[in-house]
């Protein structure tokens, strides 16, 4: 009788529209209940029975109930699920399988089955890729997933690498394909095989993509030729190899091994500038005046060279610092090293005075055993030989940026606009509280940015520098020439790593068009989007593998008195993040470890400080001693405690 009653339908509609609702993101806790976070200020309690309908991270719309002045949320509609494709560990046997997502806040096993055509008998402990197929808020009875890919077995020593690559959907091995012969590009190659070119790399490097030759000129000036490996002499634009490189965009460097952008035959052999092998190169000849200025007679040309020596960073640095046993194999090579050190000195001074020089941070290298076990982690400081190569590459990239800008008006540029204009006033106000006066408009110009950076570098600590980092914009890849505030340069376009960066291959093709006097096509903006996304994923993958290896390495230090010096890198409401100085591991110090009485403790991300009883006890960039309290292998997190 009430079936089609329009009044009843209207009443229902009215009740529905009058019931308060909120949209937000579900935050799970370890205690079964959760919260619907609407924004930074507002959240609603989700009781345990209602949490069974949702998952941490789901974006939902919920009905808000008020009882006895307590509000709670009842999930009603799924806006965007947190999990779609994910990796996890399989539980159970073939007929009754479940998968536990590999995520710190997702503990529940999700029932699942293997997808059709996936020929693997899954067993307890296997790692797999899965895709969500059912969700309670979509009208399904429960969560359900489908296993779409087997990754590896639970006890595989190389789980950190295979799981991380599968999680981010990145390639596990080098691309297939061979390049049998060089293309006829219509380029005249200058024969420079008689010159004493050298490469300087790590001892284990196989993909050498830059060689250097220096010459003293009569008037105190120096000439530098930077010769770069020439993969575009083998790989035609639009070919199968080119398309594969375009998708990968970069060689993926993970602790212990890399997954190259090009087939290894090219990256480690045919294109690699090996000692005593004749190789085609794209080269840049530049003249440096006595103060390190790059003069206007920049020349790009195609050539063939034969590297005369594969030098190693540490050996070259030792020799220049008059330590160690290593000697250059001939006076000619020794002379090259001396001249390159002079160039480095001049360019370093020029950049210090006219641009910006990054503070030296050590690189951390994992030393791994046969089974992927971490034998040691060593900090490798950036020494004179590293700086020789760095200064030569930066100079060469400045040259390419100028030539592409002036001759074509486009290229693949690294652009960094400094501070976000929306933040300029807040930035000026913050600096003022620390006694630095800047003009909010001037600081948005390249000169103003450089001036501020030099003032910050002159501060006794890096504290203020760390406070303003959040006001900076991100570096971008652009086809349009633009400034790079971070380097303090008007334009910057890389072409010195074409074996491992697709953008550098594009710039090679554009520079070759300039050399031949041909017209060139502007690269499509989509390629910069792909490159930026791949760069992001590769960085996350490197961090994920690193976290896993750090957890393995420090596991036996948990609960011991072993002390580590640690730099505070971030402060949040829940505690502090620190970086261990000796090995680069990131650890978390929970707030209760800082001070037992919560009411007397203020952890401020805004100010970058921890106050105890109103006094600043810790601030970002402080270095403190810590011990390792706990290592949680399932979440790869390291919990530290300050030494009292």
Swiss-Prot record:
GO terms for cellular component: cytosol. Residues 561-643 form the S1 motif domain. SMART domains: CSP (SM00357), RNB (SM00955). The keyword tRNA processing does not apply. Gene3D superfamilies: 2.40.50.640, Nucleic acid-binding proteins. It catalyses: Exonucleolytic cleavage in the 3'- to 5'-direction to yield nucleoside 5'-phosphates. This is Exoribonuclease 2. It comes from Escherichia coli O127:H6 (strain E2348/69 / EPEC). The lineage of its organism: Bacteria, Pseudomonadati, Pseudomonadota, Gammaproteobacteria, Enterobacterales. The gene is rnb.
């Amino acid at each position: 009788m009430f079936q089609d009653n329009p009044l009843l339908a209207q009443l229902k509609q009215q009740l529905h529209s009058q019931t308060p609702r909120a949209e937000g993101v579900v935050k799970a806790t370890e205690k079964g209940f959760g919260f619907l976070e609407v924004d930074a200020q507002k959240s609603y309690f989700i009781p345990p029975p209602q949490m069974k309908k949702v998952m941490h991270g789901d974006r939902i719309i919920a009905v808000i109930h008020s009882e006895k002045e307590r509000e709670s949320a009842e999930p009603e509609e799924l806006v965007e699920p947190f999990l779609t494709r994910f990796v996890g560990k399989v539980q159970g046997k073939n007929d009754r399988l479940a998968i536990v997502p590999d995520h710190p806040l997702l503990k529940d096993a999700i029932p699942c089955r293997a997808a059709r055509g996936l020929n693997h008998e899954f067993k307890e402990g296997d790692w797999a890729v899965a895709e969500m197929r059912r969700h309670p808020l979509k009208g399904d009875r429960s969560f359900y997933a489908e296993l779409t890919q087997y990754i590896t077995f639970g006890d595989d020593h190389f789980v950190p690498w295979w799981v991380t690559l599968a999680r981010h959907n990145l390639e596990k091995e080098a691309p297939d394909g061979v390049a049998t012969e060089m293309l006829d590009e219509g380029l005249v190659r200058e024969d420079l095989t008689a010159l004493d070119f050298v490469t300087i790399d790590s001892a284990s490097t196989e993909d050498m993509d830059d060689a250097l030759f220096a010459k003293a000129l009569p008037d105190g000036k120096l000439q530098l030729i930077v010769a770069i490996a020439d993969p575009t002499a083998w790989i035609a634009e639009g070919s199968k190899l080119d398309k594969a490189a375009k998708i990968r965009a970069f060689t993926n460097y993970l602790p212990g091994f890399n997954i190259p952008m090009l087939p290894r035959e090219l990256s480690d052999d045919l294109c690699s500038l090996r000692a005593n092998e004749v190789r085609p190169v794209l080269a840049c000849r530049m003249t440096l005046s006595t103060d390190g200025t790059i003069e206007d007679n920049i020349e790009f040309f195609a050539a063939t060279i034969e590297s005369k020596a594969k030098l190693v960073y540490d050996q070259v640095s030792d020799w220049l610092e008059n330590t160690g046993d290593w000697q250059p194999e001939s006076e000619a090579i020794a002379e090259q090293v001396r001249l390159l050190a002079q160039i480095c000195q001049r360019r370093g001074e020029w950049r210090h005075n006219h641009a910006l020089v990054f503070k030296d941070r050590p690189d951390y290298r994992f030393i791994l055993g046969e089974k992927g076990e971490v034998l040691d982690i060593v900090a490798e400081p950036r020494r004179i030989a590293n700086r020789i190569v760095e200064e030569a590459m930066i100079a060469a990239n400045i040259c390419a940026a100028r030539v592409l800008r002036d001759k074509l008006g486009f290229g693949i540029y690294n652009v960094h606009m400094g501070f976000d204009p929306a933040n300029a006033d807040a930035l000026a106000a913050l600096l003022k509280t620390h006694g630095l006066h800047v003009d909010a408009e001037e600081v948005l110009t390249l000169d103003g940015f450089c001036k501020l950076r030099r003032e910050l570098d002159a501060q006794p600590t890096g504290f203020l520098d760390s406070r303003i980092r959040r006001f900076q914009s991100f570096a971008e890849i652009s086809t349009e020439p633009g400034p790079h505030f971070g380097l303090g340069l008007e334009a910057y376009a890389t072409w010195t790593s074409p074996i491992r960066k697709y953008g550098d291959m594009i710039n090679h093709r554009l520079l070759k068009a300039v050399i031949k006097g041909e017209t060139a096509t502007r690269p499509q903006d989509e390629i910069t989007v792909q490159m930026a996304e791949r760069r992001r994923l590769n960085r996350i993958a490197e961090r994920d593998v690193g976290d896993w290896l750090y957890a393995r390495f420090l596991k036996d230090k948990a609960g011991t008195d072993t002390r580590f010096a640690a730099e505070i890198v971030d402060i949040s409401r829940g505690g502090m993040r620190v970086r261990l100085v000796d090995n680069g591991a990131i650890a978390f110090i929970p707030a209760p470890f800082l001070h037992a009485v919560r009411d007397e403790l203020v952890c401020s991300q805004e100010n970058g400080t921890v106050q105890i009883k109103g006094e600043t006890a810790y601030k970002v960039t402080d270095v403190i001693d810590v011990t390792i309290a706990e290592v949680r292998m399932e979440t790869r997190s390291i919990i530290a405690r300050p030494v009292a």
